[in-house]
């Protein structure tokens, strides 16, 4: 059963790889941004609560995001595995997710019930990739600042997963197919 969390800095190819791996293993690629948008659009009870925060310009609280993720993972199409993209983003979110996930049943009690794919790519490559998108907000200084913020927020999260022996590091500085194959090899070792 494939249960993965994808980590990586902006431009590392998380979304691309998560989607390819999800298609290959026939499990849903679950993006927290998509979950949030669909809950708001469907006016679900969780979506209504989230919209209240969003309308005020506030961040949606971790607990609400956790509840949405938990609900999404209970969906029948996620029963045989899933790939989370963009969540958890912080140690607090990871700890809460871990607690919720572990409380869901005996199978989930072991820390190895899901793994974390961390795509590593050198900063200069990330900057070049992001600049090539030619988006208005993708200026080199802005990109480098975003990378610094990402590393500051994510390093404790990486250590959290390392301590639980859940972390799988993948060299993302390769062609898409090479990275996909490296992930598949690692996933095949753990499933």
UniProtKB/Swiss-Prot annotation:
EC number: 2.7.4.3
Localization terms from the record: Cytoplasm
Residues covered by region (LID): 132-138
Coiled-coil portions: none
InterPro entries documented for this protein: Adenylat/UMP-CMP_kin, Adenylat_kinase_CS, P-loop_NTPase
The species this protein was found in: Trichodesmium erythraeum (strain IMS101)
Protein name: Adenylate kinase
First-level EC class: transferase
Binding, ATP: 11-16, 133, 174
Assembly and interaction partners: Monomer.
Keyword Glycosyltransferase: no
Lineage: Bacteria, Bacillati, Cyanobacteriota, Cyanophyceae, Oscillatoriophycideae
One family name in Pfam for this protein: ADK
Comment text on domains: Consists of three domains, a large central CORE domain and two small peripheral domains, NMPbind and LID, which undergo movements during catalysis. The LID domain closes over the site of phosphoryl transfer upon ATP binding. Assembling and dissambling the active center during each catalytic cycle provides an effective means to prevent ATP hydrolysis.
Record's function text: Catalyzes the reversible transfer of the terminal phosphate group between ATP and AMP. Plays an important role in cellular energy homeostasis and in adenine nucleotide metabolism.
Region called NMP, residue ranges: 31-60
Keywords: ATP-binding, Cytoplasm, Kinase, Nucleotide biosynthesis, Nucleotide-binding, Transferase
Residues holding AMP: 32, 37, 58-60, 86-89, 93, 135, 146
Pathway membership, UniProt: Purine metabolism; AMP biosynthesis via salvage pathway; AMP from ADP: step 1/1
GO cellular component terms attached to this protein's record: cytoplasm
BP-aspect Gene Ontology terms: AMP salvage
GO molecular function, one term: adenylate kinase activity
Catalytic activity: AMP + ATP = 2 ADP
Family of this protein: Belongs to the adenylate kinase family.
Gene for this chain: adk
């Amino acid at each position: 059963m494939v249960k993965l969390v994808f980590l990586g800095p902006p431009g590392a190819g998380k979304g691309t790889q998560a989607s390819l791996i999800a298609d290959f293993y026939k499990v849903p690629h679950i993006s927290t941004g998509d979950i949030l948008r669909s809950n708001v659009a469907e006016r679900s009870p969780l979506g209504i609560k989230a919209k209240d925060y969003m309308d005020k310009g506030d961040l949606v609280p971790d607990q609400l995001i956790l509840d949405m993720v938990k609900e999404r993972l209970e969906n029948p199409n996620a029963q045989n595995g899933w790939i989370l993209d963009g969540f958890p983003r912080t140690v607090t979110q990871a700890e809460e997710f871990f607690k919720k996930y572990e409380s869901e049943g005996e199978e989930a009690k072991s820390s190895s019930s899901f793994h974390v794919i961390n795509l590593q790519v050198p900063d200069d490559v990330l900057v070049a990739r992001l600049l090539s998108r030619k988006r208005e907000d993708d200026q080199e200084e802005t990109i480098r600042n975003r990378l610094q913020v990402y590393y500051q927020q994510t390093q404790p999260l990486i250590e959290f997963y390392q301590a639980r022996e859940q972390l799988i590091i993948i060299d993302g500085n390769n062609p898409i197919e090479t990275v996909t194959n490296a992930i598949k090899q690692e996933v095949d070792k753990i499933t």
